[in-house]
Amino acid sequence: MQSKRYLVLEDGSFYEGYRLGSDNLTVGEIVFNTAMTGYQETISDPSYTGQIITFTYPLIGNYGINRDDFESLVPTLNGIVVKEASAHPSNFRQQKTLHDVLELHQIPGIAGVDTRSITRKIRQHGVLKAGFTDRKEDIDQLVKHLQQVELPKNEVEIVSTKTPYVSTGKDLSVVLVDFGKKQNIVRELNVRGCNVTVVPYTTTAEEILAMAPDGVMLSNGPGNPEVVECAILMIQGILGKIPFFGICLGHQLFALSQGASSFKMKFGHRGANHPVKNLETGKVDITSQNHGYAIDIDSLKSTDLEVTHLALNDGTVEGLKHKTLPAFSVQYHPEANPGPSDSNYLFDDFVAMMTNFKEKERHINA
């Protein structure tokens, strides 16, 4: 017999289901993800640190978990919510079940609940604090706790590397500032011949310049960009001296460093099917996204930044470039994993930008 578990929201509503994963019951911000596949990459994405993910696709876990598709060494989300979790996955690469991996990493979950109802609630009311309990009589107490608890402010500190390390390439040298990077960013750079040095988010502009890289990549990561003040100062210190490319949180920090402002979205963009229009080419890419904050488009008017991409669903800013300096960013995930690879040409654009900048510097110094 399956053990009962309850998902409780801060507004007092609750959902009865059955136990999935760990008994280490947690609280966090509940969000929803609309991707149909890629649950392993999703639960291991550091951008979900501290959050509870509701999967809108009704069956999760049907192809198991393998060791190669993790986007981080240790998942740092606070829970998952699914309609049905497969207990008997079938795939030639499968090594563990979803339940096994959640239990291993002390992540609780719940299955057998109406995920459509939960998703509608989040869409209507915005993201909420939520938690799990295995005892119905504890629900009222948990609601009070959720209404009072303060969630962590700086999740980047939890997931950023503590010491620099290198992923070897043969050509251009890139410093990747780790705000909670997905591993596929490193892979996309490596496959283009880049030697990647991953550094902590607290690394200063002076320390980066001393490494003399050909370019700087600002990674994705969790939480509110305004909290990561040290990175804003770092970006201001390297802008114009080295080409750089920002993704997701890196995109937001780039905008803030130039005087723009951000805002918390009602329920964010999380999924692998978000259409984005490239304003320079007129083309539309289907993109992978995972963010709960966005850049205020009106705040860009007094900056030297130009909007290059817009979300077709709600018109929010999805891409920026500096008007005169070699720097650009996107809000979505061109490295995918999960999701479509429509936009991985942006890594080629970054390599071309670094090569051109390096050649220009060579002529100036000749």
UniProtKB/Swiss-Prot annotation:
InterPro entries tied to this protein: Anth_synth/Amidotransfase, CarbamoylP_synth_ssu, CarbamoylP_synth_ssu_N, CarbP_synth_ssu_N_sf, Class_I_gatase-like, CPSase_GATase1, GATASE
Residues covered by the Glutamine amidotransferase type-1 domain: 173-360
Record key words, sorted: Amino-acid biosynthesis, Arginine biosynthesis, ATP-binding, Glutamine amidotransferase, Ligase, Nucleotide-binding, Pyrimidine biosynthesis
UniProt pathway annotation: Amino-acid biosynthesis; L-arginine biosynthesis; carbamoyl phosphate from bicarbonate: step 1/1; Pyrimidine metabolism; UMP biosynthesis via de novo pathway; (S)-dihydroorotate from bicarbonate: step 1/3
Pfam families assigned to the protein according to its UniProt record, in alphabetical order: CPSase_sm_chain, GATase
Positions contributing to L-glutamine binding: 47, 221, 223, 249, 252, 290, 292-293
GO-annotated biological processes: 'de novo' pyrimidine nucleobase biosynthetic process; 'de novo' UMP biosynthetic process; glutamine metabolic process; L-arginine biosynthetic process
Active site (UniProt): 248, 333, 335
Catalysed conversion reaction: hydrogencarbonate + L-glutamine + 2 ATP + H2O = carbamoyl phosphate + L-glutamate + 2 ADP + phosphate + 2 H(+)
Enzyme class: ligase
An example molecular function term from Gene Ontology annotations: ATP binding
EC number: 6.3.5.5
Stretch list, region CPSase: 1-171
Domain of life according to the entry: Bacteria
Matches recorded under CDD domains: GATase1_CPSase
Function: Small subunit of the glutamine-dependent carbamoyl phosphate synthetase (CPSase). CPSase catalyzes the formation of carbamoyl phosphate from the ammonia moiety of glutamine, carbonate, and phosphate donated by ATP, constituting the first step of 2 biosynthetic pathways, one leading to arginine and/or urea and the other to pyrimidine nucleotides. The small subunit (glutamine amidotransferase) binds and cleaves glutamine to supply the large subunit with the substrate ammonia.
Record family assignment: Belongs to the CarA family.
Quaternary structure (record): Composed of two chains; the small (or glutamine) chain promotes the hydrolysis of glutamine to ammonia, which is used by the large (or ammonia) chain to synthesize carbamoyl phosphate. Tetramer of heterodimers (alpha,beta)4.
Name of the molecule in the record: Carbamoyl phosphate synthase small chain
Gene coding for it: carA
